[in-house]
C-alpha cells in the first residue's frame, strides 16, 4: 500500500515548496486536482523540485479536453517527472461541463472509456507499435506525421487512472484504465458492495484480472493542533 495526498494550492507558485515538503515528510505521492489552477502546470513545477515523489492528477477533467491534448500532456509530464507521472482523469458533472467549460455532455461512461482507449492508441503510435487509426463513436484520430510525433518515451508510458462514483463510470475504469480513483465520498460498504463489483464487471469485459488495476481510495481527513 502507498500513501498519497492531494495538495490544494491557493497560489500555484507554492507547488515548488509544498510538494517538496510532502516528499520530505514521507508521502509516496502528491496529486493535484482541477480547481482554482491548472492541474498539470503545478505538477510540472513540482517535478522539478522533487526526486522520487509520485505525481499525478486526481483528477483532471477529461471532458474539457480531447484525447490528443491529454496524450501530449501525459507524455510530456512523464518525461518531465522522470517516469513518476499518473494521468488521472474524471468526468465532472453535467452542469460544469456545459456551463463552465462550454463542453458536450453525453454518454459519460462510454465517452470516458473511449477517451482512455484513444489516448492509448495515440501513445502506441508514438511508441512505434502501430499506425494511428482510432475511430470511435465520439473521437477520431487517424493522422500523425513525423513533425508531430515525439517518438518513444524514454521513461515508458504513464498509467491512466479514471475516477468514478456510479456503477457505469466505475465499470469504465475496470474496462479501460490502469487504475481507479474512488470518490472521497465513499465508505467501506460502498466500496465492497458497489465499487468492487462494478470494477470486476469492467475487467471481465476487457478480459483483464483484478491484479491489472490499481485502486486509489480517497479519504477525507480533518486535523487540528490538539488531535
Task: Report the location of each language-model feature.
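Active-site-adjacent structural elements that line small-molecule/cofactor binding pockets in enzymes
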Residues: 1-227
